[in-house]
């Protein structure tokens, strides 16, 4: 479906420079865009080469004034272009309706325009909102609730009593609501601790492929609004992750830790249990965090330390062999002096 630049500008709160009635049918990369496509020229490097793209229109910063081309000027070109791409991206959506090869339990309720693919298994008393999309092989346990516009990709399991908000996306192979890793020592044995809580995932959360988010021992494991996780992330029982936090691949968060808002946890970081990670904190890649982090602090290394201190420590590492040799020589000279 074609859209006019005027329609696009309204979508992204932008301003049209040029022909507002110009219609485009999609979005494309700068070098490949054609006359019926819109592209992104959000940085100085692309703006200098604006005559080299065949695009019918460009998304640009508000301070760009070249009027030779059709432009949509916005405050944040990258975010605006992402929204434009969402508008044109229909994906490979399966047809609306319930595939006859799906298995659905009693007390099922759903909204309008739901799509349930082959091999989906739905337990008892499950509720789906409008336009929910369940790809093949999805499993929903008893009493699961999913809000409007949810997309659950293939072979994902959402276990009993878990609750998902609106516009939640969960990628293939993730498990939501598995038992937490909880065992009580009893001599040489371990007694399993029942996990009777649930997982709550709020609006506009996107969970990567192969994630495992454990249900709470009591209460809830809580993934709050706008959180984005990369692939292969583990979030343990009773963890709370604050709004709009980013969790990169292979991060592990141990039980009962609270992660604040707008936090960045870089790849392969490990967070110990029962900690508080403050709002706007940044944890570097492969960091091992064993104590709480203050709001706004940037921490790196294992054990985690302030990032600047970690950089200083790392700068010393390469010189340690030479320092060891010098110390050995000094020890020999000192021994000679002591024998005097």
From Swiss-Prot:
Under the GO molecular function aspect, what terms does this record hold? N-acyltransferase activity
Active site annotation, chain numbering: 237
Q: Name one GO cellular component term.
A: membrane
Query: What GO biological process, any one, is recorded here?
Result: lipid A biosynthetic process
InterPro entries attached to this UniProt entry: Hexapep, Hexapep_transf_CS, LpxD, Trimer_LpxA-like_sf, UDP_GlcNAc_AcTrfase_non-rep
Superkingdom of the organism of origin: Bacteria
Q: In which pathway does it act?
A: Bacterial outer membrane biogenesis; LPS lipid A biosynthesis
Provide this UniProt record's keywords sorted from A to Z. Acyltransferase, Lipid A biosynthesis, Lipid biosynthesis, Lipid metabolism, Repeat, Transferase
Q: What class of enzyme is it?
A: transferase
Q: Which PROSITE patterns match?
A: HEXAPEP_TRANSFERASES
Catalysed reaction equations from the record: a UDP-3-O-[(3R)-3-hydroxyacyl]-alpha-D-glucosamine + a (3R)-hydroxyacyl-[ACP] = a UDP-2-N,3-O-bis[(3R)-3-hydroxyacyl]-alpha-D-glucosamine + holo-[ACP] + H(+)
Enzyme Commission number(s) from the entry:
2.3.1.191
Coiled-coil annotation reads: none
The protein's matches in Pfam families, at most eight in alphabetical order, are given as:
Hexapep, LpxD
* Self-association and partners: Homotrimer.
* Family to which the UniProt record says this protein belongs: Belongs to the transferase hexapeptide repeat family. LpxD subfamily.
NCBIfam families to which the protein is assigned, alphabetical: lipid_A_lpxD, PRK00892.1
Report the function annotation for this chain: Catalyzes the N-acylation of UDP-3-O-acylglucosamine using 3-hydroxyacyl-ACP as the acyl donor. Is involved in the biosynthesis of lipid A, a phosphorylated glycolipid that anchors the lipopolysaccharide to the outer membrane of the cell.
Protein name according to UniProt: UDP-3-O-acylglucosamine N-acyltransferase
Q: From which source organism is this entry? A: Desulfosudis oleivorans (strain DSM 6200 / JCM 39069 / Hxd3) (Desulfococcus oleovorans)
Read off the lineage from the record: Bacteria, Pseudomonadati, Thermodesulfobacteriota, Desulfobacteria, Desulfobacterales
């Amino acid at each position: 479906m074609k859209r006019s630049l005027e329609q696009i500008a309204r979508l992204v709160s932008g301003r049209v420079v040029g022909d507002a009635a110009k219609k485009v049918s999609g979005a494309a990369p700068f070098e490949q865009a054609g006359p019926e496509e819109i592209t992104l020229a959000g940085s100085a490097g692309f703006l200098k080469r604006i005559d080299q793209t065949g695009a019918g229109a460009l998304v640009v910063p508000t301070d760009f004034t070249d009027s030779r081309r059709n432009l949509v000027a916005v405050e944040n070109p990258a975010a605006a272009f992402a929204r434009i791409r969402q508008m044109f991206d229909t994906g490979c959506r399966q047809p609306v309706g319930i595939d006859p090869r799906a298995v659905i339990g009693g007390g099922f309720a759903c909204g309008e325009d739901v799509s349930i693919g082959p091999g989906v298994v739905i337990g008892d008393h499950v509720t789906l909102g409008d336009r929910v999309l369940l790809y093949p092989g999805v499993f929903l346990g008893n009493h699961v609730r999913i809000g409007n516009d949810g997309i659950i990709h293939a072979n994902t399991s959402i276990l009993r009593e878990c609750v998902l908000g609106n516009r939640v996306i969960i990628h293939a192979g993730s498990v939501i609501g598995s038992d937490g890793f909880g065992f009580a020592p009893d001599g040489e044995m371990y007694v399993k601790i029942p996990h009777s809580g649930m997982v709550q995932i709020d609006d506009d959360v996107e969970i990567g492929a192969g994630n495992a988010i454990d249900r709470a021992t009591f209460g809830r494991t809580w993934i709050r609004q706008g959180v984005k996780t990369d692939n292969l992330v583990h979030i343990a029982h009773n963890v709370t992750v604050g709004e709009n936090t980013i969790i990169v691949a292979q991060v592990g968060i141990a039980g009962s830790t609270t992660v604040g808002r707008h936090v960045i946890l870089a790849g392969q970081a490990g967070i110990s249990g029962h900690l508080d990670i403050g709002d706007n904190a940044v944890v570097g890649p492969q960091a091992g965090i064993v104590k709480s982090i203050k709001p706004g602090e940037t921490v790196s290394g294992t054990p985690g330390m302030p990032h600047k201190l970690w950089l200083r420590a790392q700068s010393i590492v390469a010189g340690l062999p030479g320092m060891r040799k010098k110390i050995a020589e000094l020890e020999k000279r000192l021994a000679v002096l002591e024998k005097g």
